[in-house]
Design a protein with these regions (language model features):
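A structural boundary/capping signal
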Residues: 1-167
Length: 167
């Protein structure tokens, strides 16, 4: 495991829900990613994919999946550089475990996340009238952190598995 992977994994493991939140939610975002997530291999942006709008990772990743059905929307945590802190981020994968990120000007150093079906991404985006984080969906009461997170048949895209499971 690389130092960046160790840093990200330590962050994920430390993400236990506060006591007050446990009355409402089953898991934290970090716990969800740990339970359902995969490691992804960062690659250079393919020539046919344009750089997206800075700080609009969810929109950029959704646009890529809508434009190319072979790409799968992923959301989780990533580190832009070894020295940066983990942040919620969205990217696409090619079904081979690669992280394709058209938001950052260069690939991040490590990606850990969950692949979602295009149907789930589209329905959630339409419901919210915006491309926001599926994991941090406060507008709808964090559904993936509650009962919906226990029903992966409704959201998990198996074609988008990464290089190896996080746990």
């Amino acid at each position: 495991m690389t130092p960046s992977e160790t840093k990200l994994l330590s962050f994920l493991v430390s993400g236990e829900l506060p006591a007050a939140a446990k009355a409402v939610l089953k898991r934290s975002i970090q716990e969800f990613v740990l339970q359902c997530g995969w490691w992804y291999q960062p690659i250079e942006l393919p020539k046919q994919i344009a750089l997206g709008t800075p700080q609009e990772c969810h929109t950029n990743a959704i646009d890529l999946t809508l434009a190319d059905e072979t790409l799968i929307y992923c959301e989780g945590y990533a580190l832009f550089k070894d020295s940066s802190q983990p942040r919620i981020h969205a990217w696409v994968t090619d079904g081979k475990g690669n992280a394709i990120d058209n938001t950052w000007p260069q690939p991040g150093v490590v990606y850990a996340g969950v692949p979602f079906t295009l149907d789930f991404v589209t329905v959630t985006t339409l419901k919210n009238h915006a491309a926001i984080s599926l994991l941090d969906d406060f507008q709808n009461g964090f559904p993936l952190l509650g009962d919906l997170g226990d029903r992966p048949v409704e959201w998990l895209e198996l074609r988008g598995r990464g290089t190896k499971k996080l746990m």
